[in-house]
Amino acid sequence: MAIVSAEKFVQAARDNGYAVGGFNTNNLEWTQAILRAAEAKKAPVLIQTSMGAAKYMGGYKVARNLIANLVESMGITVPVAIHLDHGHYEDALECIEVGYTSIMFDGSHLPVEENLKLAKEVVEKAHAKGISVEAEVGTIGGEEDGIIGKGELAPIEDAKAMVETGIDFLAAGIGNIHGPYPVNWEGLDLDHLQKLTEALPGFPIVLHGGSGIPDEQIQAAIKLGVAKVNVNTECQIAFANATRKFARDYEANEAEYDKKKLFDPRKFLADGVKAIQASVEERIDVFGSEGKA
């Protein structure tokens, strides 16, 4: 099935009580790891680029083409959406033009009426090309490539108004944050999530900041209507830990490792890339999307 819009498989997740993963990529190796995991688990997946990651990779067109070409060259058979994560209005429009198949417009830092107005414009332009759209109400705590949110509970009326713009899935603040969770974090507000899903029956909710939330809370949120869970920090930490360990081992066995030419970046980064894949596969298991392709 390969490259697709995310609308159908996210809605299928909502209708059938599981969630799909939205995994952020940063480069070629990251993308390969996510694709290998999705193919191994036969799970639909969104490969996401933040604005900063896309810039690092050479721009939206380069990032889009990298993902699409890897899907083809690796023989990937599961549904893959190429998704913009937390995009400003101008970035959303650019991604629509260069061939992303799913867009998140994040206007949660704007006044509500402006957020709704711009979201509707993005929906009109994206849907004209068969591209799915995610938008956000109630800022998610933490920082995501320059968008800083203090974290709040998404107002129910704002959520209903956003859905009326025609978006396909909704990111809503329910006590979640980006990045590592502090020790004094109080957990997801599942009562508020239930109120949201009761007000929006059958509509897919997106859980941002999925890294670090206890599995039982994620699964409880899925039962209440979360159909997409974003993961980034968790994979970054897994990659960093595995790469650091390899570097320490290299330092302790430098002559041996040099003889084996383990300074080759393809070998030097291999453990880190494997750690990303393992992390993605484990998240797919938790979300319940294995075998749902």
Swiss-Prot record:
Phosphorylated. It catalyses: beta-D-fructose 1,6-bisphosphate = D-glyceraldehyde 3-phosphate + dihydroxyacetone phosphate. PROSITE patterns: ALDOLASE_CLASS_II_1, ALDOLASE_CLASS_II_2. Its cofactor is Zn(2+). Zn(2+) 2 binds at residues 106, 136. InterPro entries: Aldolase_TIM, Class_II_FBP_aldolase, FBA_II, Fruc_bis_ald_class-2. Pathway: Carbohydrate degradation; glycolysis; D-glyceraldehyde 3-phosphate and glycerone phosphate from D-glucose: step 4/4. Zn(2+) 1 binds at residues 86, 178, 208. Binds 2 Zn(2+) ions per subunit. One is catalytic and the other provides a structural contribution. It comes from the Bacteria. GO terms for biological process: fructose 1,6-bisphosphate metabolic process; glycolytic process. Its EC number is 4.1.2.13. The active site is at 85 (proton donor). Dihydroxyacetone phosphate binds at residues 179, 209-211, 230-233. D-glyceraldehyde 3-phosphate binds at residue 50. GO terms for molecular function: fructose-bisphosphate aldolase activity; zinc ion binding. It holds the Pfam family F_bP_aldolase. Keywords: Glycolysis, Lyase, Metal-binding, Phosphoprotein, Zinc. Belongs to the class II fructose-bisphosphate aldolase family. Catalyzes the aldol condensation of dihydroxyacetone phosphate (DHAP or glycerone-phosphate) with glyceraldehyde 3-phosphate (G3P) to form fructose 1,6-bisphosphate (FBP) in gluconeogenesis and the reverse reaction in glycolysis. This is Fructose-bisphosphate aldolase. It comes from Streptococcus pneumoniae (strain ATCC BAA-255 / R6). The lineage of its organism: Bacteria, Bacillati, Bacillota, Bacilli, Lactobacillales. The gene is fba.
